[in-house]
Amino acid sequence: MEDKIPFWLRVWQRLHIDFWLFIGLLAITAYGMLVLYSASGASETMFNSRIIQVLLGFIVMLLMAQFPPRFYQRIAPYLYLIGFVLLILVDVIGTTSKGAQRWLDLGFIRFQPSEIVKLAVPLMVAVYLGNRPLPPKLSETFIAIAMILLPTLLVAIQPDLGTSILVSASGLFVVFLAGMSWWLILAAVIGLAGFIPIMWLYLMHDYQRTRVLTLLDPEKDPLGAGYHILQSKIAIGSGGLSGKGWMQGTQSQLEFLPEPHTDFIFAVMGEEHGMIGFLILMAIYLFIIVRGLMIAVNAQTSFGRILAGATTLIFFVYVFVNIGMVSGILPVVGVPLPLFSYGGTSYVAIMASFGLLMSIHTHKSQFMKRS
């Protein structure tokens, strides 16, 4: 029977690759590279660097897909501990960039440990809860939340409010999908609402408060705090239906738009490709998210279901936060557009998370045989 299956298909199956998810990731990466080339001002150096990032990302994804989920259950505590130690090292010997100490420079490589933590936190929480009867007990829920808060606080003091929110959200999605009590969710929401004034007065930095106030009235300081948002909205709005054309955007090409290759690359896409480009982008993202949710629903274990579901939901949050930020409906928090913005650590970390998804999906037959 196996002889009747085409050779290329047999190779594909043995590599433990989910075809549809692979196609979605390839499509969003290709579109992102097209826009990035324009956003960088046709910089061959940046484009070549992106090619290396993409190759490394796909290699990491493919490698992670080869190992069964039980392998990640075993290494999760070590990965969590490594991420935690790296965050401490950032505070001690980290490299400062744009007023924030977020990077580790080892000479041969420079990376953000917070990106590793985005993967390690939901994995560790999923292992902890997935090995216990669900829904979790109250004590187990509090232990899981403590696992989330420790690295979140270390990221927040860098300071990196946007990433700290995403790290906490990635872990909380796991707790929620594990069956967290609705009463506890309500209590958490009320507690968070009460904590906001304290955070505003004592924990947030001046520039973070300025970003929130700027969101409410960016025109108040058009050449200062409101500059980013206003230029981004001008770029998106001027794109119209079909855009101004590839590499024809005035806001990006004339350097009015800040950070066009990272946080504000969506504005470049909107200006040059218009509403049509936006719909294409959203269709690809939706395709990836739906495929991820399908993998979560069809997973054979509690660990697989809650981890795949949380990974997919946090990917959606990345997309939502970046587009909301660039469109002026959310504060600017420095969250890149996933798999689209320039940035090696972020790209590889997200591809690694999709490698986990492929592992959960393509190795599920092993669980069925054991059961």
Curated annotation (Swiss-Prot):
The chain crosses the membrane at residues 17-37, 51-71, 75-95, 111-131, 142-162, 172-192, 275-295, 313-333, 337-357. Peptidoglycan polymerase that is essential for cell wall elongation. It catalyses: [GlcNAc-(1->4)-Mur2Ac(oyl-L-Ala-gamma-D-Glu-L-Lys-D-Ala-D-Ala)](n)-di-trans,octa-cis-undecaprenyl diphosphate + beta-D-GlcNAc-(1->4)-Mur2Ac(oyl-L-Ala-gamma-D-Glu-L-Lys-D-Ala-D-Ala)-di-trans,octa-cis-undecaprenyl diphosphate = [GlcNAc-(1->4)-Mur2Ac(oyl-L-Ala-gamma-D-Glu-L-Lys-D-Ala-D-Ala)](n+1)-di-trans,octa-cis-undecaprenyl diphosphate + di-trans,octa-cis-undecaprenyl diphosphate + H(+). Belongs to the SEDS family. MrdB/RodA subfamily. Keywords: Cell inner membrane, Cell membrane, Cell shape, Cell wall biogenesis/degradation, Glycosyltransferase, Membrane, Peptidoglycan synthesis, Transferase, Transmembrane, Transmembrane helix. Pathway: Cell wall biogenesis; peptidoglycan biosynthesis. One of its GO terms (biological process) is cell wall organization. InterPro entries: Cell_cycle_FtsW-rel_CS (IPR018365), FtsW/RodA (IPR001182), RodA/MrdB (IPR011923). It is a multi-pass membrane protein. Pfam families: FTSW_RODA_SPOVE. The keyword Calcium does not apply. One of its GO terms (cellular component) is cell division site. Its EC number is 2.4.99.28. GO terms for molecular function: lipid-linked peptidoglycan transporter activity; peptidoglycan glycosyltransferase activity. Its main location: membrane. It is found in: Cell inner membrane. It comes from Haemophilus influenzae (strain ATCC 51907 / DSM 11121 / KW20 / Rd). This is Peptidoglycan glycosyltransferase MrdB.
